[in-house]
């Protein structure tokens, strides 16, 4: 969906919140060769992996990676983006018992989004507007049953239009997108 929103030669600025190993940001930069991006991540280990991946994909000159608890390392007045993407932790804390051991071996900070799985989406919904240009886009990966709740969080702010959910190839809700009207 995101790639269909922009022309291949678009000169846009992308922010990836909870970038982890940089997969989403680096993939977007691969397909948008004139774009530049910033990835912010609280985990030093994940950020180190993102730096390795950035070097591997020869995108260091277009990527800035920062250790940050969500938006804390950014200056809202001086940091404006055309697109904000995020695959935040979204598993409900109570669902840990349903996960395989392989998943549970992952750092819990990367998995759990609070009691209802929406803690990070609340922050994203309230804060993204500070860092988006007018008519900027957001795209958040979600859990299979979180589309309506995440859409409602965005609607409550009154800052977004064209709020919708994109399904994955299996027909499951996967990404919520919207346009910032600030």
Language-model regions: role of each:
Residues 1-96:
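Conserved SAM/SAH cofactor-binding pocket of Class I
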Residues 9, 32, 58-60, 106, ...:
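Short, well-ordered coil/turn elements that cap or connect secondary structure elements
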Residues 9-11, 80-83, 107, 142, ...:
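N-terminal/domain-start segments enriched in small and hydrophobic, helix-friendly residues
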Residues 28, 102, 124-128:
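Class I S-adenosylmethionine-dependent transferase superfamily signal
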Residues 81-82, 101, 152, 159:
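S-adenosylmethionine
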Residues 88-90, 179-182:
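C-terminal beta-strand of the catalytic ATP-binding
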Residues 90-119:
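Mobile active-site "lid"/loop adjacent to the S-adenosyl-L-methionine
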Residues 115-180:
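Conserved Class I SAM-dependent methyltransferase catalytic core
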